Amino acid sequence: MASVFPRLRKGAILTFDPATGVPIGTIMLQYNPETLTRSLQPQAVSEEPDRTEIFRLKGPPIETIKAEVEIDATDQLGAHVPDPVAVRLGIGPQLSQLELLVYPSSTVLLANEALSLAGTIEILPMESALTVFAWGAQRITPVRITELSITEEAFDPRLNPIRAKVSLGMRVLNVDDVGFITPAGSLYMAYQLAKEAMAAQAPGRGA
């Protein structure tokens, strides 16, 4: 599955079919964020472990990632031959791509409504795509979008946004969330193994 990831120097958000791992789409970050905030919450056995459990962990930490992303159509609009999509829609398509990460598909919504009207008693919650955050070759991990805040800062004469800042909040999905024998579980284990390999290169390791 790792072979589907582009060899690029920009961060990206990718989507896959959660069951098969088949790629669905790629959202390249136009500009890499200047900062990336990560938080890790250790999973202790209990809130107040006794002496026999003080060094035990239930599983991987709960890791969250926050990033501020800028999207700007200035270059496309100012080119010798302006981008026709940017001229017509500004950065609306890019914003819509990001927003749809937290939407169920309209096809599934309509299908569930049809089931409801047909009297189906139990309708399963709607499944979203597997979302993957790629930040360099060593940090490719499955995530769930927990926060998406958009500030539109400039508009064209048609009121299409042409510049915006997007605040992204993500929670890393680990094997406790998705299991081992799934595309997401395989990606998470590769992510942790890459972290362990990187830690082994630190000065003083094993000294």
Specify the residue positions occupied by each region the protein language model found:
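Acidic, Ser/Thr- and Gly-enriched intrinsically disordered low-complexity segments
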Residues: 1-207
